[in-house]
Amino acid sequence: MARYFRRRKFCRFTAEGVQEIDYKDIATLKNYITESGKIVPSRITGTRAKYQRQLARAIKRARYLSLLPYTDRHQ
C-alpha cells in the first residue's frame, strides 16, 4: 500500500515578510477564494492566524468595493 506524500504547508505571507495584506492586490486575493467565491480556510492554505484575519478583512473590503465577486456567475 503506497503512502500519500503530503506537501508541508507554510505561510507565504510570513515567508515573503508581508506587513499588511492590501485589499487592492486582487491577484493575491484570488488565490485565497474558491471558484464559488468562498474564503479558503487556513487549515487548507497553511496561512498563519494573523494573516488569515488580514486576508479575510481584505477580501471583504474588495468585495464591498466590487473588486471581487461575492459569488460565482450563476450561468
From Swiss-Prot:
PROSITE patterns: RIBOSOMAL_S18. GO terms for biological process: cytoplasmic translation; translation. The modification N-acetylalanine is found at A2. InterPro entries: Ribosomal_bS18 (IPR001648), Ribosomal_bS18_CS (IPR018275), Ribosomal_bS18_sf (IPR036870). Part of the 30S ribosomal subunit. Forms a tight heterodimer with protein bS6. Pfam families: Ribosomal_S18. Keywords: Acetylation, Ribonucleoprotein, Ribosomal protein, RNA-binding, rRNA-binding. Binds as a heterodimer with protein bS6 to the central domain of the 16S rRNA, where it helps stabilize the platform of the 30S subunit. This is Small ribosomal subunit protein bS18. Belongs to the bacterial ribosomal protein bS18 family. It comes from the Bacteria. One of its GO terms (cellular component) is cytosolic small ribosomal subunit. It comes from Escherichia coli (strain K12). GO terms for molecular function: mRNA 5'-UTR binding; small ribosomal subunit rRNA binding; structural constituent of ribosome.
